[in-house]
Amino acid sequence: MKFKILFTIILFVFASLGSADELRNAVESKDRSEKNIVRDEFRKPYETLSFFQLEPNMTIVELSPGGGWYTEILANFVRKSGNLIAAHFSKDSERAYFRNSRINFEKKVKENNLYEKVTVVDLNSELSDPSSVDAVLTFRNLHNWLGPNMDKIFSNTYIALKPGGLFGIVEHRAKVGTSMEAMK
Protein backbone atom coordinates (compact mmCIF):
# COMPACT_ATOMS: atom_id res chain seq x y z
CA MET A 1 0.00 0.00 0.00
CA LYS A 2 2.77 2.44 0.95
CA PHE A 3 4.53 1.63 -2.32
CA LYS A 4 1.39 2.47 -4.34
CA ILE A 5 1.00 5.82 -2.60
CA LEU A 6 4.67 6.67 -3.04
CA PHE A 7 4.54 5.59 -6.70
CA THR A 8 1.46 7.79 -7.29
CA ILE A 9 3.17 10.80 -5.70
CA ILE A 10 6.30 10.27 -7.80
CA LEU A 11 4.22 10.02 -11.00
CA PHE A 12 2.39 13.25 -10.12
CA VAL A 13 5.64 15.11 -9.43
CA PHE A 14 7.23 13.97 -12.68
CA ALA A 15 4.10 14.78 -14.68
CA SER A 16 4.14 18.31 -13.23
CA LEU A 17 7.83 18.69 -14.02
CA GLY A 18 7.16 17.67 -17.61
CA SER A 19 4.63 20.47 -18.07
CA ALA A 20 6.99 22.96 -16.44
CA ASP A 21 9.80 21.84 -18.74
CA GLU A 22 7.57 22.18 -21.80
CA LEU A 23 6.54 25.66 -20.70
CA ARG A 24 10.15 26.67 -20.06
CA ASN A 25 11.07 25.29 -23.49
CA ALA A 26 8.30 27.37 -25.09
CA VAL A 27 9.43 30.54 -23.28
CA GLU A 28 13.09 29.94 -24.14
CA SER A 29 12.42 28.73 -27.70
CA LYS A 30 14.64 29.87 -30.56
CA ASP A 31 11.37 30.33 -32.49
CA ARG A 32 10.63 33.48 -30.48
CA SER A 33 11.51 36.87 -31.92
CA GLU A 34 14.30 38.90 -30.34
CA LYS A 35 11.90 41.83 -30.10
CA ASN A 36 9.60 39.77 -27.87
CA ILE A 37 12.35 38.11 -25.81
CA VAL A 38 13.60 41.55 -24.71
CA ARG A 39 10.24 42.09 -22.94
CA ASP A 40 10.54 38.88 -20.86
CA GLU A 41 12.35 40.77 -18.11
CA PHE A 42 9.25 42.89 -17.53
CA ARG A 43 6.41 40.56 -18.49
CA LYS A 44 7.83 37.44 -16.81
CA PRO A 45 6.05 34.96 -19.09
CA TYR A 46 7.30 31.79 -17.42
CA GLU A 47 6.18 32.91 -13.97
CA THR A 48 2.85 34.22 -15.28
CA LEU A 49 1.95 31.13 -17.29
CA SER A 50 3.19 28.79 -14.53
CA PHE A 51 0.79 30.49 -12.13
CA PHE A 52 -2.12 29.48 -14.37
CA GLN A 53 -1.04 25.80 -14.18
CA LEU A 54 -1.46 25.26 -17.91
CA GLU A 55 -0.86 21.87 -19.50
CA PRO A 56 0.40 21.38 -23.06
CA ASN A 57 -2.60 19.22 -24.00
CA MET A 58 -5.13 21.93 -23.15
CA THR A 59 -7.38 23.88 -25.43
CA ILE A 60 -6.59 27.50 -24.59
CA VAL A 61 -8.24 30.72 -25.78
CA GLU A 62 -6.22 33.92 -25.81
CA LEU A 63 -8.52 36.97 -25.80
CA SER A 64 -7.28 40.03 -27.71
CA PRO A 65 -3.83 38.72 -28.64
CA GLY A 66 -2.80 42.00 -30.29
CA GLY A 67 0.46 41.40 -32.14
CA GLY A 68 0.84 37.94 -30.61
CA TRP A 69 3.43 38.40 -27.87
CA TYR A 70 1.95 35.65 -25.66
CA THR A 71 0.63 33.79 -28.72
CA GLU A 72 4.22 33.09 -29.72
CA ILE A 73 4.79 31.24 -26.44
CA LEU A 74 1.37 29.60 -26.13
CA ALA A 75 1.40 28.28 -29.71
CA ASN A 76 4.72 26.57 -29.07
CA PHE A 77 3.52 25.22 -25.71
CA VAL A 78 0.39 23.50 -27.11
CA ARG A 79 1.88 22.63 -30.49
CA LYS A 80 2.28 18.86 -29.91
CA SER A 81 -0.93 17.96 -28.10
CA GLY A 82 -3.18 20.97 -27.50
CA ASN A 83 -4.91 23.81 -29.32
CA LEU A 84 -4.82 27.58 -29.17
CA ILE A 85 -7.71 29.80 -30.19
CA ALA A 86 -6.88 33.48 -30.70
CA ALA A 87 -9.98 35.66 -30.25
CA HIS A 88 -9.05 38.82 -32.13
CA PHE A 89 -10.75 41.97 -33.39
CA SER A 90 -13.30 41.54 -36.16
CA LYS A 91 -12.16 41.86 -39.76
CA ASP A 92 -15.35 43.90 -40.27
CA SER A 93 -14.69 46.41 -37.48
CA GLU A 94 -15.51 50.05 -38.19
CA ARG A 95 -12.12 51.00 -36.73
CA ALA A 96 -9.18 50.73 -39.13
CA TYR A 97 -6.78 49.97 -36.26
CA PHE A 98 -8.80 46.88 -35.29
CA ARG A 99 -9.09 45.65 -38.89
CA ASN A 100 -5.37 46.15 -39.54
CA SER A 101 -4.39 44.48 -36.28
CA ARG A 102 -6.43 41.40 -37.22
CA ILE A 103 -5.03 41.34 -40.78
CA ASN A 104 -1.43 41.56 -39.50
CA PHE A 105 -2.06 38.88 -36.88
CA GLU A 106 -3.58 36.47 -39.41
CA LYS A 107 -0.67 37.08 -41.78
CA LYS A 108 1.78 36.24 -38.98
CA VAL A 109 -0.13 33.04 -38.16
CA LYS A 110 -0.31 31.89 -41.78
CA GLU A 111 3.36 32.54 -42.55
CA ASN A 112 4.89 30.50 -39.71
CA ASN A 113 4.42 26.79 -38.97
CA LEU A 114 4.80 27.58 -35.27
CA TYR A 115 1.16 28.67 -35.41
CA GLU A 116 -0.22 25.54 -37.11
CA LYS A 117 -2.43 24.77 -34.07
CA VAL A 118 -3.80 28.33 -33.81
CA THR A 119 -7.36 29.09 -34.87
CA VAL A 120 -8.39 32.75 -35.17
CA VAL A 121 -11.96 33.77 -34.27
CA ASP A 122 -13.73 37.08 -33.66
CA LEU A 123 -13.47 38.36 -30.09
CA ASN A 124 -17.17 39.28 -29.93
CA SER A 125 -18.42 35.93 -31.24
CA GLU A 126 -18.59 32.42 -29.83
CA LEU A 127 -15.07 31.50 -28.81
CA SER A 128 -15.54 27.76 -29.22
CA ASP A 129 -18.15 25.06 -28.69
CA PRO A 130 -19.82 25.30 -25.27
CA SER A 131 -17.84 23.71 -22.43
CA SER A 132 -14.91 22.81 -24.69
CA VAL A 133 -12.09 25.05 -23.47
CA ASP A 134 -9.72 24.36 -20.57
CA ALA A 135 -8.43 27.91 -20.10
CA VAL A 136 -9.18 31.42 -21.35
CA LEU A 137 -6.38 33.95 -20.91
CA THR A 138 -6.03 37.65 -21.52
CA PHE A 139 -3.06 39.92 -20.98
CA ARG A 140 -3.40 43.67 -20.30
CA ASN A 141 -6.75 43.99 -22.06
CA LEU A 142 -9.46 44.18 -19.42
CA HIS A 143 -9.35 47.98 -19.23
CA ASN A 144 -10.07 48.14 -22.98
CA TRP A 145 -13.34 46.29 -22.55
CA LEU A 146 -14.95 48.52 -19.91
CA GLY A 147 -18.53 49.00 -21.01
CA PRO A 148 -20.92 46.78 -22.96
CA ASN A 149 -18.17 44.73 -24.65
CA MET A 150 -17.07 43.36 -21.29
CA ASP A 151 -20.42 41.64 -20.66
CA LYS A 152 -20.35 39.97 -24.08
CA ILE A 153 -16.74 38.83 -23.73
CA PHE A 154 -17.28 37.48 -20.20
CA SER A 155 -20.47 35.69 -21.27
CA ASN A 156 -18.72 34.07 -24.25
CA THR A 157 -15.85 33.07 -21.97
CA TYR A 158 -18.19 31.43 -19.47
CA ILE A 159 -20.00 29.51 -22.21
CA ALA A 160 -16.76 28.23 -23.79
CA LEU A 161 -15.08 27.09 -20.56
CA LYS A 162 -15.40 23.53 -19.35
CA PRO A 163 -16.76 23.18 -15.80
CA GLY A 164 -13.83 24.03 -13.54
CA GLY A 165 -11.99 25.75 -16.41
CA LEU A 166 -9.65 28.66 -15.79
CA PHE A 167 -10.20 32.32 -16.71
CA GLY A 168 -6.77 33.95 -16.28
CA ILE A 169 -6.52 37.74 -16.35
CA VAL A 170 -3.29 39.74 -16.28
CA GLU A 171 -3.91 43.48 -16.07
CA HIS A 172 -2.14 46.78 -15.67
CA ARG A 173 -2.35 48.45 -12.30
CA ALA A 174 -3.93 51.87 -12.16
CA LYS A 175 -2.73 54.47 -9.72
CA VAL A 176 -4.57 54.34 -6.41
CA GLY A 177 -7.69 56.48 -6.59
CA THR A 178 -8.11 56.33 -10.39
CA SER A 179 -11.81 56.37 -11.25
CA MET A 180 -13.46 53.82 -13.54
CA GLU A 181 -14.38 56.69 -15.86
CA ALA A 182 -10.74 57.71 -16.22
CA MET A 183 -9.83 54.12 -17.12
CA LYS A 184 -12.28 54.03 -20.02
Task: List each language-model region with its residue ranges.
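Conserved beta-strand signature within the Rossmann-like core of class I S-adenosyl-L-methionine
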Residues: I85, G164-H172
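Conserved class I S-adenosyl-L-methionine
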Residues: N57-G66
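Class I SAM-dependent methyltransferase Rossmann-like catalytic core
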Residues: L23-F51, E55
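A short, conserved alpha-helix within the catalytic core of class I
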Residues: D122-L123, N144-T157
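Helix-to-beta-strand junctions that scaffold the AdoMet/dcAdoMet cofactor pocket
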Residues: E55, V78-R79, W145-G147, L161-P163
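A short acidic, Gly/Pro-enriched loop at the edge of an enzyme's catalytic core
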Residues: E126-V136
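A short glycine-rich, Lys/Arg-flanked "PGG" loop and its adjoining helix->strand segment in the class I
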Residues: A75, D151-L166
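Conserved Class I S-adenosyl-L-methionine
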Residues: M180-K184
